[in-house]
C-alpha cells in the first residue's frame, strides 16, 4: 500500500493521491499545520504540494498487517524541487468494500538532532 501512495505522488496528480484516502480519512501533512479530515481538505493539501516537482524515497518502514488493517511507520525523504526533506510517517490503511484506503496519515519533518 505504501508503494502505491509513493507511485501516486510521483504522478504529480493531486486527485490520484487524494483518491487513496478513506472518505473520513485524516491527514496531518509534512508541509502544513492544518489537520485535514475528509476528501476535500486532503485534496487541497496535495493540490498545493504537487504544484512543485515532488519525489519520495522510503528509507525505512515497519509494517503490521491483518486481513482488514495495515499499520505502517518509518522514515522517508521528500525531494521537492530538488531539495531533500527528511521526514517520519505513520499510515493506517483499512480495507473498505474490498479496497484499501488510508484512514490516517501522519507525517512530520525529522528533528535535526535525533
Model-derived features: positions:
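Short, well-ordered alpha-helical segments enriched in acidic and aromatic residues
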Residues: 11-24
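Surface-exposed, charged secondary-structure patches
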Residues: 43-81
